[in-house]
Amino acid sequence: MSDSNNISSLYPPPPPYVKFFTKDNLERLAEYQSSHVTTDPEQITCELDFLIPPPVPSAGHYRAFGSVWQVKDELPDLETVGLRNLYDDRGQHGNNYQYKIKELHKLLKSLLLNMLELVSVLSVNPERFPDKVEHIRTILFNIHHLLNEYRPHQSRESLIMLLEEQLEHKKEEIANIHAICDKVQAKLAAMCKQYIADD
């Protein structure tokens, strides 16, 4: 068997600096942090520096679990990815979601039309289908991009609906509690009247 067919371990081995996390080092850490002033938190001067967590990245990117992640999660433009933008989004950034919904409807109609055209091209001249398939692909990428731009609004609306449902549920519970309290008070008042009448 070749070395390339070997199964790698399910979990990666622990980093080498894990051996510095001993009980003695943890006890010395507070004293070390108070006496030692660091100008560069990335610089390692002794084994206790491994116990101090690195600063949270504020810009650019970072590496975690073998992947590179952007600090600010932004949706790239279609042009930067190398695709043609089929809708006009100049001046439409931000919270103009009605515009995005209208553009989605336009793209869906265009997709249906192109699917019909693809069927007709396949029935008449099957060799000409790659251009139509590429156009459908571009439309689908544009729809996908618009849907991704719409996700923050959808999340906010879903959260609002969830909170409104919880509020209605709490109001119903409070109304039920008040009704039960009224019944208990009426029952106690009736018992008091009966007790006074018996005396």
Swiss-Prot record:
Function as written in the Swiss-Prot or TrEMBL entry: Component of the Mediator complex, a coactivator involved in the regulated transcription of nearly all RNA polymerase II-dependent genes. Mediator functions as a bridge to convey information from gene-specific regulatory proteins to the basal RNA polymerase II transcription machinery. Mediator is recruited to promoters by direct interactions with regulatory proteins and serves as a scaffold for the assembly of a functional preinitiation complex with RNA polymerase II and the general transcription factors.
Any single biological process term in GO: regulation of transcription by RNA polymerase II
GO molecular function annotation: transcription coactivator activity
Annotated organism of origin: Eremothecium gossypii (strain ATCC 10895 / CBS 109.51 / FGSC 9923 / NRRL Y-1056)
Name assigned to this protein: Mediator of RNA polymerase II transcription subunit 7
InterPro entries to which the protein is assigned, alphabetical: Med7/Med21-like, Mediatior_Med7, Mediatior_Med7_sf
Entry GO CC: core mediator complex; mediator complex
Places the protein is found: Nucleus
Known partners and oligomeric status: Component of the Mediator complex.
Keywords tagged on the record: Activator, Nucleus, Transcription, Transcription regulation
Family to which the UniProt record says this protein belongs: Belongs to the Mediator complex subunit 7 family.
Source organism, top-level taxon: Eukaryota
